Amino acid sequence: MIIDQLISTTSKYDTPTMCNAMDIILGTRSAIGFTKSSMVTAQNSTQPVVGFAKTAKIRASSPPLVSQKEINNIRIEYYEYIVKNEENPVVVIEDTDFPNCIGAFWGELNVAVHKGLKIKGTVTNGLLRDLGMLDSGYQVIAGSIGPSHAFVHLTELDTPVNILGLEIKPGDFIHADQHGAMTVPKKHLDALPHALDLVVKKEVPILEAARQRDFNIEKLKKAFQASWDIK
């Protein structure tokens, strides 16, 4: 599938609908492939963050074990990495202090920098701060909110990460919104448009029946059967 078409199509749906579409593709429900805890968002927007993962790890609970010069070099290397050779990059950062995160990597400065670099958004299990000062149009979906950056520093780049129970590898297709995040294996990307369309169509008979004034259990049974018959 053409990447621009994939992004355009999946951006029209929320993350729960994407999870339902994966159930259709797999032919069964699943307990993997999505985050397992509540998240917070930088922007009061339902527009999802959609793209391909650029991954890193951070820590804030203790000072870095290398010199400030090396820390600065790693940070520049990180910015170079996230803009290199990937269409629609989404930054995915694991805070290895989790579940006791104390320092925010995400605030006014990094939001401005990432927005300026044309990154599509961020998913992290770590902290977010500077609420009310963040540039509009850049979404950070984070694990929690806190006041300080503490000793926050990058420790690894381009590595598998775990965000609230969701395993993400560099280059994975990711879809996230205020509900949380999920990934779609690349082998299933071509099947997504049909599966998403089917999710919506199968809900229509039930929703239409339920919203009628004379709705009752018999109408519900018929609506469910109509939904099950849609293939």
Roles of regions detected by a PLM:
Residues M1-P170, V184-K231:
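Feature captures the catalytic cores and cofactor-binding loops of soluble hydro-lyases/lyases
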Residues G180-M182:
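Channel- or pocket-lining gating/hinge segments that regulate access to a cavity or pore
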